[in-house]
Each structure stands twice: as structure tokens, then as C-alpha cells.
Amino acid sequence: MAVQTLTHENLNDTINNNDIVLIDFWAPWCGPCKMQGPILDKLVETVSEKATIAKLDVDQFPAPASQFGVRGIPTLILFKDGDVAQTLVGVQQEGTLLSAIEAALK
């Protein structure tokens, strides 16, 4: 399974129709965001049965970033049962993200 690409049209459905969702708010010009991408690609292989991993381009879809208080990118927001469980700002390593997902599953 691959990292899903979200738009303003499928964002709410993705959050509300999955138990655990990790969304990377990013932009194509952002150097740290480019570093985060391969980490998420690797993470999705590990957690695809437990969580949905997705990304949303804040340049194309600024409203959701504003809605969730994203002020810097990359920002990763972990949702559990449709609610924000954790917000992580800056590049996050796979172990940190895996720990956050595992904690949300408890």
C-alpha cells in the first residue's frame, strides 16, 4: 500500500472512515518535507494494516492546513477515531511515528 494523496474533497472522509490516520501536511518546495516523504513510504509498509498514512499539499489546499492550525511544514497530525490525537512538527523519524501510532492504538 502507498501513502495516500489527499485533497479537500476526500480529507474528511479519510479522517472519519479510518480508525487511525496520520496526515503529512507538506509542500513540494519544502526541503524538510522532501526528507519526510521516504520515511512515510517506509512507514506505510510497516503499518498499512493498522493505520492510514496520507499527505496533503498545503499549497494546493490551504484551508485544511488552516483548519488544523498548521503553521510550519512538515506538520504531521495523527487522528484517532476522527479526532486529533497528536501533532508533530518538523521531520519525524520512522520510530517516532511508529510509537505515536502504537500509542494511539491502545
Which sequence ranges carry the predicted segments?
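Conserved Rossmann-like nucleotide-binding pocket used by diverse enzymes
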Residues: 2, 26, 52-54
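A short beta-strand-turn-helix
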Residues: 3-20, 62
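Short pre-active-site segment immediately N-terminal to redox-active cysteine/selenocysteine motifs
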Residues: 19, 26-29, 72
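Hydrophobic beta-strand anchors of alpha/beta hydrolase catalytic cores
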Residues: 22-23, 53, 76
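Typically the conserved alpha-helix immediately C-terminal to a functionally engaged Cys/Sec
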Residues: 34-47
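Conserved acidic residues
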Residues: 57-59
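Structural micro-motif
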Residues: 62, 68-77
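Non-catalytic, surface beta->alpha helical segment in thiol-disulfide oxidoreductase systems
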Residues: 80-106
